[in-house]
């Protein structure tokens, strides 16, 4: 699980959050300390975003998010959802569907239901909250140190709120 979370954090965080936040800091002439805080915030937001993306792929409404509803299962993508499921007694019923290129909607729904029953969905929803809380703590620290203007803090909080509640 630790490896999956680390990979998820760096995969999405770097190009979607860390680099854009650092670029914004450079463009407005922020200090290196501000850049460093923004990088930490970006890593946390990126992890939350990726975990939320994984949840949407398996449990989300495809009409809402526009993705293939079972692509992660079909591709055998090792996510936090799967890592948790592997540790449960439900794994045998899930594994037979995992990584099957020919996964049909009925079997995909059965795997999704088992993932929900074994607690994977709840577990990963809890994981989403942790990096959002860490991002908020890092943001408060940066604000307290006078490294970020209030408008930047407000924008980052709005972004974090969208990350945590996204449905697509």
Question: What is the meaning of each model-derived region?
Answer:
Residues 1-168:
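All-alpha prenyltransferase/terpene-synthase fold signal
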């Amino acid at each position: 699980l630790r490896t999956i979370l680390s990979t998820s954090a760096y995969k999405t965080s770097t190009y979607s959050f860390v680099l854009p936040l650092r670029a914004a800091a450079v463009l407005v002439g922020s200090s290196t300390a501000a850049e460093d805080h923004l990088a930490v915030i970006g890593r946390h937001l990126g992890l939350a975003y990726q975990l939320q993306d994984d949840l949407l792929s398996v449990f989300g409404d495809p009409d809402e998010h526009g993705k293939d509803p079972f692509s992660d299962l079909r591709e055998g993508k090792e996510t936090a959802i799967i890592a948790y499921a592997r540790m449960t007694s439900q794994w045998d019923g899930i594994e037979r569907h995992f990584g099957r290129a020919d996964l049909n909607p009925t079997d995909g729904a059965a795997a999704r239901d088992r993932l929900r029953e074994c607690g994977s969905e709840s577990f990963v929803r809890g994981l989403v909250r942790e990096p959002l809380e860490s991002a908020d703590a890092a943001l408060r620290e940066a604000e307290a140190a006078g490294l970020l203007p209030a408008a930047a803090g407000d924008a980052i909080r709005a972004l974090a709120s969208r990350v945590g509640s996204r449905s697509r």
